[in-house]
Amino acid sequence: MSRLQFQLQTRDGRARRGRLTFPRGTVETPAFMPVGTYGSVKGILPDDVRALGAEIILGNTFHLYLRPGLDIIADHGGLHGFCRWDGPILTDSGGFQVFSLAHRRKITEQGVTFASPTDGARVFLGPEESMKIQKVLDSDVVMIFDECTPYPATEDVARRSMELSLRWAQRSRNAHDELGNDAALFGIVQGGVHTDLRSRSAEALQAIGFDGYAVGGLAVGEPEHERNAMLDHLDPELPSDRPRYLMGVGRPEDLVEGVARGVDMFDCVMPTRNARNGHYFTSFGTVRIRNSQYARDMDPIEPGCGCVACTGGYTRSYLRHLDRCNEMLAPMLGTLHNLFYYEKLMADIRAAIEAGTFLAFRESFYAARGAVAPPL
């Protein structure tokens, strides 16, 4: 029996307002999950992550398995004790990271053999191995092991990939149950940009039975309109009483469009990675702090923002100086700002759904950027 309870509280159009309840805490949805690839959200403390409004974070099974290894994490009682985060954690299965090693991997029915990016050693990962690793990590949400369908892919390639992922999904389900793991287990819908394959994947996953359903294989190069079309197609085909997770999709616009199409959960490295590259998100667009126009700019990143970078009086001029000097404080302040922006965006979205004003919120979101909302 899964430790996860999901309550769908209200809707506004297709946008959903809900709550995930775990023994380690509750998560208000729609939710954005900061990514802690190696067991930390880069550059900031777990208490900072919590203070920014995050209630759940993501850990990376693939990288944690390779380094530091399961024995060391087990010494700490699992990933929560290792990284000092006491709230819920979702761990991915490693499938996407294996996908990214395109020239150093071999896929068979059993799983994937690849050269470790850390030391070149031969490593095998399959559904059973992924479930065992995630059991040791003791995450609150476990993802099945799947193959991320590349883009572009012919329908035949996408079909064979999707069918392999379905067989791995059943093996993941079996292994998860045999391990006696009471963490939530999420299935992952694949099928590329082919609606019939997405439908087959969603139907087959529901026949197996999972605690939540993720949409994978997007944000891999496809145009935005194709991604939105897949979400439009899947919205009525996924069970309404289970959480829905759009994997790895993370521009602010993508979050708004995902929510508009029934998505409950998101993750992406974008707010943290972009902060390290001097790109700061605001309600009016992106501040690229390395541009010369900010050399003597006395404003904070976003006037009126409640993050510590903006309320602390740090000017764009100062942040540009820190960035140009490669000072550690620049990405730290940028990360604090970007994650604050993302978590506040999600809080504002939740409030708009509760008030029945999400569509108006969506229009104003784009208007502030000088843009027009894409069609729904």
From Swiss-Prot:
Pathway: tRNA modification; tRNA-queuosine biosynthesis. It catalyses: 7-aminomethyl-7-carbaguanine + guanosine(34) in tRNA = 7-aminomethyl-7-carbaguanosine(34) in tRNA + guanine. One of its GO terms (molecular function) is tRNA-guanosine(34) queuine transglycosylase activity. It comes from the Bacteria. Keywords: Glycosyltransferase, Metal-binding, Queuosine biosynthesis, Transferase, tRNA processing, Zinc. The keyword Thylakoid does not apply. It is an enzyme of class 2 (transferase). One of its GO terms (biological process) is tRNA-guanine transglycosylation. Residues 248-254, 272-276 are annotated as: RNA binding. Binds 1 zinc ion per subunit. GO terms for cellular component: cytosol. SUPFAM superfamilies: tRNA-guanine transglycosylase (SSF51713). Its EC number is 2.4.2.29. Catalyzes the base-exchange of a guanine (G) residue with the queuine precursor 7-aminomethyl-7-deazaguanine (PreQ1) at position 34 (anticodon wobble position) in tRNAs with GU(N) anticodons (tRNA-Asp, -Asn, -His and -Tyr). Catalysis occurs through a double-displacement mechanism. The nucleophile active site attacks the C1' of nucleotide 34 to detach the guanine base from the RNA, forming a covalent enzyme-RNA intermediate. The proton acceptor active site deprotonates the incoming PreQ1, allowing a nucleophilic attack on the C1' of the ribose to form the product. Homodimer. Within each dimer, one monomer is responsible for RNA recognition and catalysis, while the other monomer binds to the replacement base PreQ1. This is Queuine tRNA-ribosyltransferase. It comes from Stenotrophomonas maltophilia (strain K279a).
